[in-house]
């Protein structure tokens, strides 16, 4: 199997793993929200952090739709540069988000992980889609 053809399943698996972790965080975000707050917090503070994390996770899911659309439509499936970028960023996201969940990192760290590991590959995917005149 050539190196390019082995990137396709690896990219799909890392995209899927990242998606599963995001959905898991979405369903069980209570512990992560509490780690963002001081020991004594009000209901208002909790709702604010819950809204922030919900928005961040929702935008991440929207970017996944964009990236999966480009991948599954075949526009970027065999583009080796996008495959490597996606493989590296989504693998890094899986590791970082695992630490985010298990070590209960503060919520602001999610935005750093989001900007590097979700926005960057989605923007490149958008450029690829636009260059093929798919969108």
From Swiss-Prot:
The keyword Membrane applies. Pfam families: TMEM107 (PF14995). GO terms for biological process: non-motile cilium assembly; protein localization to ciliary transition zone. Its main location: membrane. It is a multi-pass membrane protein. It comes from the Eukaryota. Keywords: Cilium biogenesis/degradation, Developmental protein, Membrane, Transmembrane, Transmembrane helix. It is found in: Membrane. One of its GO terms (cellular component) is membrane. InterPro entries: TMEM107 (IPR029248). The keyword Nuclease does not apply. The chain crosses the membrane at residues 7-27, 55-75, 83-103, 110-130. May play a role in cilia formation and embryonic patterning. This is Transmembrane protein 107. It comes from Danio rerio.
């Amino acid at each position: 199997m050539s190196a390019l053809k082995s990137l396709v399943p690896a990219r799909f698996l890392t995209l899927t793993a990242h998606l599963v972790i995001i959905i898991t965080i979405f369903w069980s975000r209570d512990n992560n929200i509490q780690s963002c707050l001081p020991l004594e917090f009000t209901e208002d503070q909790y709702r604010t952090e819950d809204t922030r994390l919900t928005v961040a996770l929702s935008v991440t899911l929207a970017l996944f739709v964009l990236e999966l659309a480009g991948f599954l439509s075949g526009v970027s499936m065999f583009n080796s540069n996008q495959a490597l970028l996606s493989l590296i960023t989504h693998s890094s996201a899986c590791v970082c988000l695992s630490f985010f969940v298990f070590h209960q990192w503060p919520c602001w760290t999610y935005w750093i992980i989001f900007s590097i590991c979700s926005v960057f590959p989605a923007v490149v995917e958008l450029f690829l889609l636009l260059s093929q005149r798919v969108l």
